[in-house]
Amino acid sequence: MKVAIVHYHLQPGGVTRVIENTMRAWEQNDTGPDQCVVLTGRPYPGNTLQQVQVVEGLDYAEAKDAISSTSLKQRLEQGARDALGALPDIWHIHNHSLGKNPALTGAVAELASAGASILLQPHDFAEDGRANNFSNLSSSKERAYPTAPQIHYAALNQRDQSFLQKSLEGSLSPVHLLANAIPENQPNLACSSGGKFPDLPENLFLYPVRAVRRKNLGELALLSTAYPEFHFANSLGPTNPSFLPVYKSWIDFASRQGLQLTYGIGEQTEASFPELVGLAHSLVNVSVAEGFGLGFLEPWTFGKSLCGRNLPEITADFTELGLNLDHLYNEIYVDSSLIDKQELEQATAIALKKVYSQYGRNLPDNGIIQAYNSICTAEGVKFGYLNEDLQKSVIEKAKGSELTIAEIRKQTSLHLLNDDQIEKNKYAVKENFSLQMYGKKVFGIYQQITQANPETVQFTGCEPMLDRFLCPERLNLLRV
């Protein structure tokens, strides 16, 4: 079996790690395709992947700058021939419909029309709060999701699988659940000593993420307000220059409030990332949106506890497989008296109108009311759905209220799991997300595709998938 794996780039990051882990899994299992090449739009800076071909025009590109879909299809085919000696039996393509380069979406449609056997593995979606990406898909929107028995999809989680299945309902393309692998050879970082780095806080609760808006930095400030006995920190600042002013405003806010909180702590110490993790009492999560949810799995493999926010839409798969996340909270509700309701109403209306306009959709009747009521509920106001200004206002008011602080502590109940519980979660991750199992699943899907009886390809556009993601009740002001 010959396989061509395709992605826009192989820079360090999530998809690159998935591709590298796939290769590692096949090497360790001594199973997998006979030949495999990775086709990418940029030179590969790593050394794990042995067979890599750079394809001009595959990298990120705006619609106005992208090459034609036909040209990219031809270049992909030539790159595969050069490496494999023939066209591949399977095209395994990552994030084809994300809107990072409309030529790839179109090239996939052309490969599908030509009868190619394809595995499409979306990690993220242009329809999910990425309106600029959606717009960049341009005319390729109408053929974004090809379907036929010889074209399969692989989803990271049950939510994505369900959304794809509903969007492709009636088609002949199966949608597999393919969770990412977690390598087993992670260092145990549970017992590191802080003596080497006396400048770092001893009571560190580390949020091991780079600062982006959906990571919900304000909730870290709220937790710091409610738990002054702990020192909270995220690891890295933003790389996106447009988010830098917001990031700096949180740094200034934390300083003015006198919080035990450091944003970008990894950039203020000589400690390496593993050393930071080792020094932390616990890892913490406050993100409001994730694709796969690696941050809910990796801490246990390091021998660390995790506390903070759960994302049941993402972690339902994990808990079904034995991972215990019952100690995490699903939401922090604050009393509506802490909110300027008029400001929230205005922010909700502006955000919802903006989102629907960006996606070229008409705002549904009562949409603003539905969105507002999904944020301001009978239980209270969802803190993680507020924008930065509203979050800061809540924190300022909460700091002077013992009753509010007590309520936040009751809801969040931050504490460390004992060694036995950590070990049980570590075992659940090892058993269900191993490289060995991942490699077998991927190769098993390939075999199913090659055994399919090919039929004429049909196409589903982006609109059904957009229907799944775009609804007033899913509005989060941090994602607009």
Regions found by a protein language model. Give the residues of each.
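A short, active-site helix/loop in glycosyltransferases that binds the activated sugar's phosphate group
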Residues: 135-175, 182-185
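Acidic anion/phosphate-binding donor-loop and adjacent secondary structure
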Residues: 130-133, 176-203
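Conserved donor-binding/catalytic core segment of Leloir-type glycosyltransferases
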Residues: 4, 196-215, 221-224, 233-234, ...
